[in-house]
Amino acid sequence: MTYKDPSLPTAARVDDLVARMTLQEKAGLLFHTISWFAPPPGAETAESMIDGRHMNHFNVLGGGSPREMAEWHNALQERAAATRLGIPVTLSTDPRHSFSGNPGASMMAGAFSQWPEPPGLAAIGSAELVRTFADMARQEYLAVGIRVALHPQIDLVTEPRWSRANGTFGQDAELTSRLVRAYILGFQGERLGPGSVACMTKHFPGGGPQKDGEDPHFAHGREQVYPGGRFEHHLKPFEAAFDAGTSQIMPYYGMPVGTEHEEVGFGFNKGVITGLLRERYAFDGIVCTDWGLITDAFIMGQEMPARAWGVEHLTPAERVLKAFEAGVDQFGGEACPDLLAEWVEAGRISTGRLDASVRRVLREKFTLGLFDAPFVDPDAAGEIVGRAAFARAGFEAQTASLTLLKNGPLPLAEGVRLYVEGVDAGLAAGYGKVVPAPEEADVAVLRLAAPYEPRPGAFEAFFHSGSLAFDAAEIDRITRLQRTVPTVVNVYLERPAVFPEIAEGAAAVVADYGASDRALLEVLFGRAEPKGRLPYELPRSMAAVEASPSDVPGGTRDPLYPFGHGLLS
């Protein structure tokens, strides 16, 4: 068969395979859904979707040891090879190299090397380091069979309350553009090929300007608003991604309000997908919707309506038609290829339109070498994933990303009497004498996380939204501690926290974006150098946040610390 001959050009192989495929096989190719490494009770398995729905794109949730993941991948490839045409599986993943775990956005590093979150890479600001990270992550992904990265996330943090800030490179379009080029080149290389991990860059055309900072995973966050008239500004990082050759694009859930575009979610929006992405930018890669636009679901026991914002009145079948007519190729987080096939059978979607998307998806599979070398080596996976050089580089990035916002006593002297909160006392004992009460200490070290308002539902609870300010009781507790002993305050900036009273009373303030206790202590005791600069400004008050336009970077009045602030030694 021509499509199985690796000596032939990719275009010829694609043409041959498309001609052999049934409608059901084509439709199955265009759905890219979740598969658990260890499925929860009642979840449909990847194997059943390969056999029964002709699907072969799976977003992996969870994980095991590198060997176990590689063996699981190989078993899926064996299952796919036994199908009529033997179309191989493509596995994808959300980020899994940092400190945050959110089943809708990212996973803890686990066996993989552990790095700061993307704002930490932005705080360092080195394109060379970002490319190094991406290249190391690429090698770890390849080792276990992951061939598509559901990242980078290059939205601009122009609304500080937005819960997805910690997946971005911060507020600045120029910095984000510089880093995304390096990121894509590290994962994909100069040209996509058998050694690449394809990037699904998101969320086109920029997911930062969320009304009140609410996220469009949920109905109350469905609107994206542009009071500052900056719609075009949010496109700049995507222009850099196109220049770097991103293989795929994911539109966001949100619907634009008050722009020239139809007020429907971006995945249904023909003016955005066809008009902007396909025609203005001439993007001919894969466009995959964000997850769950078509059907309702239960996620972690929480009822989640389809994110069909602006088209809630349409049936699931009608939503499939509208998204496909808008110009998407694949449906993320869905497993209903029958709905697409029915529109082709009814003549509403032409075979030519269907085949255009099928060709894009197959072209990537062939280019990645999946038809010619679908299996991975479980022994090699155990050696590559989390190897010492990768772990060391990740740790060094953690220390470098730490951002010194205010300093008095640093570096601390070895053997100093320490009172610690939020820091492993046993680990801290290797640096100083840990004491049980602040009154006995020479200095206190306090680790805090950016505040948020807890939300109902097990799934929504992972999306830290609402106020960025500490409550009055916590401020009072911390300022009393600061009056008792000189206090070094470390704040994890998953969002741009508001903490003027705490900063004023602190002897030193250090920001982090995902760093271990050891990384923090190495910096506090002068064994490593903090090199970070803020990737987004820190507002002085919630009133300033609420008054700032959601689409304008650095729009809060008189920030506590401006974008780019950082005391370097």
Show the residue positions of the predicted features.
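Binuclear metal-dependent hydrolase catalytic cores centered on His/Asp/Glu-rich metal-binding motifs
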Residues: 211-231
